[in-house]
Amino acid sequence: MTIYQFLRLFVLWACLPHFCCPELTFRRTPGIQQMTAESRAPRSDGKILHRQKRGWMWNQFFLLEEYTGSDYQYVGKLHSDQDKGDGSLKYILSGDGAGTLFIIDEKTGDIHATRRIDREEKAFYTLRAQAINRRTLRPVEPESEFVIKIHDINDNEPTFPEEIYTASVPEMSVVGTSVVQVTATDADDPSYGNSARVIYSILQGQPYFSVEPETGIIRTALPNMNRENKEQYQVVIQAKDMGGQMGGLSGTTTVNITLTDVNDNPPRFPQNTIHLRVLESSPVGTAVGSVKATDADTGKNAEVDYRIIDGDGTDMFDIITEKDTQEGIITVKKPLDYENRRLYTLKVEAENTHVDPRFYYLGPFKDTTIVKISIEDVDEPPVFSRSSYLFEVHEDIEVGTIIGTVMARDPDSTSSPIRFTLDRHTDLDRIFNIHSGNGSLYTSKPLDRELSQWHNLTVIAAEINNPKETTRVSVFVRILDVNDNAPQFAVFYDTFVCENARPGQLIQTISAVDKDDPLGGQKFFFSLAAVNPNFTVQDNEDNTARILTRKNGFNRHEISTYLLPVVISDNDYPIQSSTGTLTIRVCACDSQGNMQSCSAEALLLPAGLSTGALIAILLCIIILLVIVVLFAALKRQRKKEPLILSKEDIRDNIVSYNDEGGGEEDTQAFDIGTLRNPAAIEEKKLRRDIIPETLFIPRRTPTAPDNTDVRDFINERLKEHDLDPTAPPYDSLATYAYEGNDSVAESLSSLESGTTEGDQNYDYLREWGPRFNKLAEMYGGGESDKDA
C-alpha cells in the first residue's frame, strides 16, 4: 500500500464520526508529493524539478432533510491549498441545484442550502467544484465532482394504496384461514434506520379477525362464524413505522369482510300441515297451490327440490319445482270427482340439491310436510255413458223407427233430470229426431244410402234444473244398403252396324252399374226383352255383354236405326232389373269395317254445330246487344254538372269568372281602360244577389285618381263588401256586374222601345216587406193608376 492510499484511508476514518454534523468543514489536505521518473527529470540548468500532485480528498457531503432553522443550512466547505487567504482565488459551484438550492461563498468555499430539502423528492445531488484565479480567471485546480447525499428522517407515515378494501371468506371457516393481505408503503429510506420498517396491527375487528404484524395478512380468529348470524364485518388495520415503537408514524385502512354462504342450513317447512282446495271441475294440469320450504342459505345453496313421497293422492296430483321462486307447485294429474272422493292427503319432501359433505354432521338437508287437498263440489254438466255413439240402420226402415238411444246422467249428488236435444246444424234436412226424455234417436224422414251413407249428428244433454249445464256427444249413423236400385247402362252407347255385316259380328260391348253396394259385390245378368231376328246378346259373366248380329247384311235406306231393348238384372234380394234401349244405326262401311256414312238424320248433327253450341252463341249475341243499348241510354242521360247548383250554395266554393265566353264579335282586343274608369270605381252599387233588410244612405267614397289600378279597384270593392251591413254572416259571392234579366226591348233607343214604363212590373218590391212599401208605391203604382 502506498503512502497516498494510506493517507486517504486515514482522512476517511477521521471524518466518519462527524458525518452527521452539517457544520463540519471539509478541507483539502496538503498535496502529497509523489515523485515519478518524469517528475525527477533534471532541468537544463542542472536542477531537479519536483511536480506536486494535488487531488480532492472528498467526494461527498451529507445533509439532513427537512431543516427547520431560520438561517441557511450549512453543507460543507471547499478549500484549495493554493488558497493563501488573500482572496485571490474564486470558488465556483455547478451542477444539480447550483446557484438556487446550493450556494457557495466565492472567497471561503462554504456551501449552504437555501431551503428545506425533502429526501423523498431527491435523495442526492451531483455537483462540480472548481477554484480559479480571480484576476486571470484561470483554474488553479481541475474541476472535480462531488455528491451531496440527503440523510433521511422519519417524516413520512405508512400509507395504504386503498382507503377501503373489500374481501370475503366462507362462513364456518377454521381459525387461521387467510382472508386478504394488505400492504402499506413508507416513503422514508428503508436502508437508514427504522423509518421505513412497518408493523401491522388490528384496531377494530377483534376477536373475529387477526393480522400478521410483518406481512399484513388478515386471518380468521374465531371458529364457526355463521353468515346467518352476521354477514358483514369491518376491520381497521394500522401500519406503524419505526418497527412499531413509540414515536413512529402510522396509517390506517378499512377492510370490509363479507362471509360468503355455504350450505350449512337444511330447508324447513314453516308448517307441519298445509291445507289446499280445488274444484272438481279443474282440468288436468291446473295448479292447486304451492308449498315452500325456507332455507337460510342463499344462491345455489338454497335450491330445493320438491317431490311427493307418500299419501293417498299420489296418482291424482303431481308437484313441480319452480326454480325462480323455489316453490313446489301442486297440479292436478287426473280428473277429480267430488262424488267419488272429497279429501286427499299428500306427504311432500323438500331437499337441497347441492349438499356440502363437510356439513353432513349438521343433519339431513331435507324436510317434510303434510298437504291436505279438499275437493269442492261444482254443478257439473251431464255425463254421457260413452264418448261417442255409432248406430247402424238399413235404409228401408219406416219413418219413426228408433235407431238407437243415448244415455247421460247428472254426476252431482242432486241427480237432476236430463233433457236431450239434437243440434240441428248437424241435421239440416231434419232426417232424425230425438226423444227429449229418454234420448231415443229415431227417423223423421225416409233414408237413402245412395244420397248419404253417413250422418254425423250431435246430441246435447242439458240439466232440466240448470239448462246452462250442457254436454255434447257425437252420434255417427251409418246407413246400411238395401237392394232398392236396378242396374243401368254404365254409359250412353253410340252403336252402329255396317250394311255389309255378317252374322255373329260384334258391334258393341256393354256394361252396367248399380247404386247399391251388396256385401258380396255386384253381379249383373244381360238378356233381350224379346227374341230379335237381327241382334242377340251374349253375357260374358263378368258384368259385361256383347251385342252380336244375327243376319247377313243391312240396308240403311230401308231401316236406318234399330232399337234393341236389353234387360239388366242383379243377383241381390230382392232382385232388381231394368230395361235399357240400345240405339243401333245402320251405316255404310269400307272393307275394313270403318264407318263412312250413315243415314241423313244421323249425319245432320255431326256435320254442323250442336244445339247447345248454337244456344250459347245466341245468348252471347243477346247479352252484347243489351250492353250496347244500356251504354247508349246512359250516355244520353248524362248531363253536365252546373258550376253552382243554386245561388244559396256559393259558400266556400270555387267560382269561375270566365263563363261569359270570348266577348262580342266586334271586340278586337281587351281594353284595360274600362277597369280604370274612376266613375265606375266611385259609384256605390246596390247588391241584387240578396234582398236588402234595411235602407241606408249611400256613402260617397273619395274620388280616386285617374291612374287607379285593377288591384285598387278590387281592394275598394272588397272593403265595401266587408263594411256592408246587409252582407250575410258567411262568405258569399258578391256579384257587382249584375245587369238584371234579359231586356224585352229590341233596342236601347227609347223611340224603338216596344214597351212603356207602365208596363214594367214592380210588384216584387211589395214582397220585400213593409219597409219598402213606399218604394213599391212610387214604382208600382196604386189601384187608381190601374183604373186610369
UniProtKB/Swiss-Prot annotation:
Some GO term, biological process aspect, for this entry: which one? synaptic membrane adhesion
Please indicate the ranges of residues that lie on the Extracellular side: 23-613
Topology of the protein relative to the lipid bilayer:
Single-pass type I membrane protein
Phosphoserine: residues bearing it:
S784
> What name does this protein carry?
Cadherin-10
Q: Which residues cross the membrane?
A: 614-634
The species is: Mus musculus (Mouse)
All residue ranges annotated as the Cadherin domain in the record: 56-160, 161-269, 270-384, 385-489, 489-603
CDD domains from the UniProt entry: Cadherin_repeat
Q: Which residues form the signal peptide?
A: 1-22
Record keywords? Calcium, Cell adhesion, Cell membrane, Cleavage on pair of basic residues, Glycoprotein, Membrane, Metal-binding, Phosphoprotein, Repeat, Signal, Transmembrane, Transmembrane helix
Question: Has UniProt tagged this entry with the keyword S-adenosyl-L-methionine?
Answer: no
> Which ranges of the sequence are coiled-coil?
none
Propeptide stretches in the record = 23-54
List, in alphabetical order, the Gene Ontology terms for molecular function in this entry.
calcium ion binding
Which cellular component, as a GO term, is one annotated location? synapse
